[in-house]
Amino acid sequence: VTTTPAGYGTAMTTMPATESMGFGPLRISFDGRVLRPRPWTEAQSTWAAEILTTAPPGPVLELCAGAGQIGLLAVLGSSRPLVCVDMDPAACDWARHNAADAGLADRVEVREGPMDEVLRDSERFAVVVADPPWVRRDEVTRYPEDPVLAIDGGDDGMEVAWMCVDVARHHLLRRGTLLLQLGTVAQVDALRDRLADDDLVVTEVRRCERGVLVRLDLT
């Protein structure tokens, strides 16, 4: 039985139409309040799943989770728990919904709020997956179909990405991995420069259809 997030079907509430799409073997539901899943971001899930085969034991953390599709697909073939974090209540509702639809509700926890506040200081993760907004603030009007919160990366497009890096640095297990999505090679270069003497090291970069995936390992 498929359910929808709270608030649907009430006489006093008008909600955007529900949509669904395939994401790998998963069926992901969402509406216009959250960023539409991009099929090409399956590459991030696939790479994360590969990393999990040799990562240290431990759960997976997804930051800026949206409807949850990247993290859900990443852990689908494993038995690892997943924690999804997002600021947007609607995104969190859909992430819970999609976890249940995927049969993963028993090992997926969704937390709503700032990423640096909803994690316990002692929590550690084997892999962190992050798809932060990376569009420069002065360019968000080029994408009127997308919720601003989901794409606004600040003045340089890196504001939320830096937050993801800081959270990952604190919460990764030793030898753990952050798999980060960015928008441009220039953003990757900025990341390399800032982390030149850091314990979190850029070890591989892959270009995708629209964006760049960066693997960072905690040494």
Residue ranges and their predicted role:
Residues V1-M12, T219:
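Actinobacteria-biased recognition of intrinsically disordered, low-complexity terminal regions
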Residues T13-T54:
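Class I SAM-dependent transferase core
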Residues S29, E109-R111, T203-R206:
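General small-molecule cofactor/ligand-binding pocket signal
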Residues W40-Y143:
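Conserved SAM/SAH cofactor-binding pocket of Class I
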Residues C84, G153, L180:
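Conserved SAM-binding loop
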Residues P132-V160:
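Mobile active-site "lid"/loop adjacent to the S-adenosyl-L-methionine
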Residues M158-R215:
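Conserved Class I SAM-dependent methyltransferase catalytic core
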